């Protein structure tokens, strides 16, 4: 439990019980201090001078992210979050705009796909929503698309996707793969050979809100056509420089760089193993709570556990009650989160490495008492 205690000791004391890292993890003292120090430096010397001074820290953040996903540091750009990243990528996509994704694709991602004129086709999946790689391979070979988009770990269901296997199958068919790693980065192994990967700071890496990353391999990047500035303008900027262009919160990016560094120092493999253990413990503790059904198989290697009500309880109302009456933070996932897969809303917990069995039992007891 050394990892769990170190993670907890590195942060402010929690007010209540935080089981919501899939929404927003708790930042460490070091992350908060780095973010604050940069903001103070902006006030002392000016925002642009401070940003120049922060270049080594920001470059270290790129390198740290790159090491987690198997890219070069020069392939990584900062964004304001995952939604921003997917829109940047899809709006720059050249040629035919067709893609295949999971039936349980994240609602905002589907919105970005539609807004950028993509025709979307569903990948074959099993009853748990896990992609069937062999079937997908046959379908994509017979009816290819311009790209495959895979959300490696959904926000409404804690099922780990076989990302590496799907990437290999797609590459055999000559199709590039984009990975949404918003829930996966810092949680699952994301070094899977994808052509592009994007993610958020605020979830399992426990960085500040309002920051994300997008990594694109050079072979794909050179084909992209960013909207701003127009490609025919005589401006000496690379594609990735164009993608990163725009106003941003430099202090938050510095804090994110520190957060990724902390994750590397803790050991990504150790963190993954502990989060898998957290998921198993959560499902075992919650399996006996009357009125709720645990959706995920107990051995899924993720820390996301979702609960379906079996007696008509409203997850959103239960979430509000848990916060107001017990100080327990969870997420209610409504149908819009995965509009083509979800049939009923769920209550989600996503504890980080520091959660204890006593805390999980405390949550289970509160759930039994919830109206």
UniProtKB/Swiss-Prot annotation:
Keyword Lyase: yes
Catalysed reaction equations from the record: S-(hercyn-2-yl)-L-cysteine S-oxide + AH2 + H(+) = ergothioneine + pyruvate + A + NH4(+)
Disulfide bonds: none
Entry-annotated residues carrying N6-(pyridoxal phosphate)lysine: 203
GO biological process: ergothioneine biosynthesis from histidine via gamma-glutamyl-hercynylcysteine sulfoxide
Coiled-coil regions listed: none
Keywords on record: Lyase, Pyridoxal phosphate
EC number: 4.4.-.-
Any one GO MF annotation of this record: hercynylcysteine sulfoxide lyase activity (ergothioneine-forming)
Involved pathway(s): Amino-acid biosynthesis; ergothioneine biosynthesis
Pfam families found in the cross-reference section: Aminotran_5 (PF00266)
Domain of life: Bacteria
Keyword Acetylation: no
Top-level EC class: lyase
Required cofactor(s): pyridoxal 5'-phosphate
PANTHER family: CYSTEINE DESULFURASE, CYSTEINE DESULFURASE 1, CHLOROPLASTIC
Function: Probably catalyzes the conversion of hercynylcysteine sulfoxide to ergothioneine. Ergothioneine is a secreted antioxidant that protects mycobacterium from oxidative stress.
Family designation: Belongs to the class-V pyridoxal-phosphate-dependent aminotransferase family. EgtE subfamily.
Protein name: Probable hercynylcysteine sulfoxide lyase
Organism lineage string: Bacteria, Bacillati, Actinomycetota, Actinomycetes, Mycobacteriales
């Amino acid at each position: 439990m050394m990892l769990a205690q170190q993670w907890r000791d590195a942060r402010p004391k929690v007010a209540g019980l935080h089981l919501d890292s899939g929404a927003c993890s708790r930042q460490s003292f070091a992350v908060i201090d780095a973010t604050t120090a940069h903001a103070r430096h902006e006030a002392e010397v000016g925002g642009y001078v401070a940003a120049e001074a922060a270049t080594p820290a920001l470059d270290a953040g790129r390198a740290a992210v790159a090491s987690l996903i198997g890219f070069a540091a020069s392939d990584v750009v900062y964004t304001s979050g995952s939604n921003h990243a997917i829109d940047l990528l899809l709006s720059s996509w050249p040629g035919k705009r067709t893609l295949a994704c999971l039936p349980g694709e994240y609602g905002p991602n589907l919105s970005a796909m539609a807004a950028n004129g993509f025709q979307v086709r569903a990948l074959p999946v099993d009853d748990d929503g896990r992609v069937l790689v062999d079937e997908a391979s046959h379908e994509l070979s017979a009816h290819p698309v311009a790209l495959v988009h895979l959300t490696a770990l959904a926000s409404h269901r804690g099922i780990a996707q076989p990302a590496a296997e799907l990437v290999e199958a797609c590459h055999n068919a000559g199709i590039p793969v984009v990975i949404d790693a918003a829930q996966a980065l810092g949680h699952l192994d994301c070094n899977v050979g994808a052509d592009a990967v994007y993610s958020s700071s605020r979830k399992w890496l426990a960085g500040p809100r309002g920051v994300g990353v997008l990594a694109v391999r050079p072979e794909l990047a050179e084909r992209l056509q960013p909207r701003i500035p127009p490609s025919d303008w005589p401006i000496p900027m690379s594609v990735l420089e164009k993608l990163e262009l725009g106003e941003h919160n430099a202090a938050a990016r510095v804090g994110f760089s520190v957060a990724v560094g902390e994750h590397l120092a803790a050991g990504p493999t150790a963190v993954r193993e502990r989060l898998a253990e957290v998921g198993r413990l959560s499902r075992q503790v919650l399996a006996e709570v009357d009125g709720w059904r645990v959706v995920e198989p107990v051995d899924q290697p993720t820390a996301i556990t979702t609960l379906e009500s079996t007696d008509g309880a409203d997850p959103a109302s239960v979430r509000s009650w848990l916060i107001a009456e017990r100080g327990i933070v969870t997420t209610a996932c409504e149908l819009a989160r995965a509009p083509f897969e979800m049939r009923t809303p769920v209550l989600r917990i996503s504890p980080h490495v520091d959660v204890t069995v006593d805390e999980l039992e405390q949550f289970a007891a509160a759930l039994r008492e919830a109206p």
